[in-house]
Amino acid sequence: MDEADRRLLRRCRLRLVEELQVDQLWDALLSRELFRPHMIEDIQRAGSGSRRDQARQLIIDLETRGSQALPLFISCLEDTGQDMLASFLRTNRQAAKLSKPTLENLTPVVLRPEIRKPEVLRPETPRPVDIGSGGFGDVGALESLRGNADLAYILSMEPCGHCLIINNVNFCRESGLRTRTGSNIDCEKLRRRFSSLHFMVEVKGDLTAKKMVLALLELAQQDHGALDCCVVVILSHGCQASHLQFPGAVYGTDGCPVSVEKIVNIFNGTSCPSLGGKPKLFFIQACGGEQKDHGFEVASTSPEDESPGSNPEPDATPFQEGLRTFDQLDAISSLPTPSDIFVSYSTFPGFVSWRDPKSGSWYVETLDDIFEQWAHSEDLQSLLLRVANAVSVKGIYKQMPGCFNFLRKKLFFKTS
């Protein structure tokens, strides 16, 4: 598949994953020899086996099926009555071709004799590179920014860093916390995603609060001198907690909380000197409280406004005053002015975070989709803005991801 078709598929992936009816496609894909039977079986087993996971894997694998893969896929859509998607892809493909001039369409310009003679060249006034938008049409400008150590973190090592995923699913009965069905789907998606971004991924499941802290300390005490970055992902129930800088807390399987502030503080310059000056990224999929956001009315025809196929569950637990002393004492002890830290929350403080038992959490599912499509060309903050926009329009109840950004530079993931 050529690069233009590949870019088109990535731009359209969110809509395809939302609308593609994969069950109708298998025979058509086989008859047009786009895929072989064992490939179809692999796609059907992708993720949780849900329609969305199958659709996502199909689009990813389609990129590897040759130069005619996209037009053949469009024909398969037409064969199975999915005319709107077929027309959408065909129109966008034609528009992309028309917007790119070819040599045969260019008219030669004949220079007048008087201007063929070289003139004295005048120095051009330097023009600043626009780095504010996050997206870059000029590949050269993007690569120049990636390689500028004054403007962007340089992730050049292989692997570029450690990634620890703590996935708490089953909680003790005394905690009163429900099993987080669907979290294993989130965990697997993130394991694959950060592996593809050149991280060494380690997964630890069902940890008590004490074991969570020990796992984090163990990671912080490793030598990160030859690495460029560090990622911590926590999938658990959560609650509000008093704080100085980073709100919220996450629960161990014993029902005891660990404040996000404590987690971040484990990786500060004093506790983890080998990560000094390097980006430390934290992704928290847990509730920030117990409020359910009904949103407010806006005029919209977006398909994402419809609620998911199954009832989502919150990762919510009410605010506990008993956490106040715990968090306050910990925060006062030695938390320095934060730098090179980025904390991404699945929801706005005080509100619940929704998780679908069959397809995983809204936040992780969207994060995975956005990283797949845009991580090669956009920086971390731009990616998370896309995630926030996509998650905010889902479901009957609303959810608004957010972040605390103490990075000093732009961060582009290593994708090749």
UniProtKB/Swiss-Prot annotation:
Molecular function GO terms recorded: cysteine-type endopeptidase activity; enzyme activator activity; identical protein binding; peptidase activity; protein kinase binding; SH3 domain binding
Activity: how regulated: Inhibited by the effector protein NleF that is produced by pathogenic E.coli; this inhibits apoptosis. Inhibited by BIRC6; following inhibition of BIRC6-caspase binding by DIABLO/SMAC, BIRC6 is subjected to caspase cleavage, leading to an increase in active caspases.
Propeptide section residues: 316-330
Modification after translation (UniProt): Cleavages at Asp-315 by granzyme B and at Asp-330 by caspase-3 generate the two active subunits. Caspase-8 and -10 can also be involved in these processing events.
Annotated protein name in UniProt: Caspase-9
Disulfide bonds: none
Residues carrying Phosphothreonine: T125
Positions where Phosphoserine occurs in the chain: S302, S307, S310
CDD domains associated with the record: CARD_CASP9, CASc
Keyword set includes Ubl conjugation: yes
Domain CARD, residue spans: 1-92
Keyword Phosphoprotein set for record: yes
UniProt organism field: Homo sapiens (Human)
Tissue: Ubiquitous, with highest expression in the heart, moderate expression in liver, skeletal muscle, and pancreas. Low levels in all other tissues. Within the heart, specifically expressed in myocytes.
Active site per the UniProt annotation: H237, C287
Subunit structure: Heterotetramer that consists of two anti-parallel arranged heterodimers, each one formed by a 35 kDa (p35) and a 10 kDa (p10) subunit. Caspase-9 and APAF1 bind to each other via their respective NH2-terminal CED-3 homologous domains in the presence of cytochrome C and ATP. Interacts (inactive form) with EFHD2. Interacts with HAX1. Interacts with BIRC2/c-IAP1, XIAP/BIRC4, BIRC5/survivin, BIRC6/bruce and BIRC7/livin. Interacts with ABL1 (via SH3 domain); the interaction is direct and increases in the response of cells to genotoxic stress and ABL1/c-Abl activation. Interacts with BCL2L10.
Keywords: Apoptosis, Hydrolase, Phosphoprotein, Protease, Thiol protease, Ubl conjugation, Zymogen
EC top class, as a word: hydrolase
Effect after changing Y153F: Inhibits tyrosine phosphorylation. Reduces caspase-9 subunit p35 formation in response to genotoxic stress. Attenuates ABL1/c-Abl-mediated caspase-3 activation, DNA fragmentation and UV irradiation-induced apoptosis
Family of the protein in this entry: Belongs to the peptidase C14A family.
Annotated region described as Disordered, given as residue ranges: 294-320
Residues annotated with Phosphotyrosine modification: Y153
Gene Ontology BP terms: apoptotic process; cellular response to dexamethasone stimulus; cellular response to UV; DNA damage response; epithelial cell apoptotic process; fibroblast apoptotic process; glial cell apoptotic process; intrinsic apoptotic signaling pathway
Reactions listed under catalytic activity: Strict requirement for an Asp residue at position P1 and with a marked preference for His at position P2. It has a preferred cleavage sequence of Leu-Gly-His-Asp-|-Xaa
PANTHER family in UniProt: CASPASE RECRUITMENT DOMAIN-CONTAINING PROTEIN 18 (PTHR47901), CASPASE-3 (PTHR47901:SF8)
Taxonomic superkingdom: Eukaryota
Protein EC: 3.4.22.62
